[in-house]
């Protein structure tokens, strides 16, 4: 997934073209992401570290009668310099994510 609205990108660790966060130095990093979907839709995402699945985020609006559903998750990951983290859809299960209301953040702890 590419989060195209970037409000802060200290050190340019987030690549807006690829959606990848690249560690500029080694250490422990915290990552958070939020997904919003509308009534009747769902969207499943994964956070990935160098191609390895770390955690899921399942946003399910199929059981609500109106409005939107949101879901968030956090992952703490030990990274080496130049390691990459990104968010991807899970196994083709992404049906609808409400663009401007989804976000991703990462920082060194």
Q: What positions do the PLM features span?
A:
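Extracellular jelly-roll beta-sandwich "head" domains, especially the C-terminal globular C1q domain
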Residues: 1-109
């Amino acid at each position: 997934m590419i989060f195209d609205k970037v409000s802060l990108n200290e050190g340019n660790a987030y690549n807006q073209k690829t959606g990848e966060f690249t560690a500029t130095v080694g250490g422990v990093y915290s990552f958070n992401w939020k997904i919003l979907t509308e009534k009747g839709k769902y969207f499943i995402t994964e956070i990935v570290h160098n191609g390895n699945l770390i955690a899921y985020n399942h946003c399910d609006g199929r059981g609500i009668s109106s409005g939107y559903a949101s879901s968030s998750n956090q992952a703490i990951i030990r990274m080496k310099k130049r390691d990459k983290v990104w968010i991807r859809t899970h196994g083709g299960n992404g049906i609808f994510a409400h663009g401007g209301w989804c976000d991703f953040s990462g920082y060194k702890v």
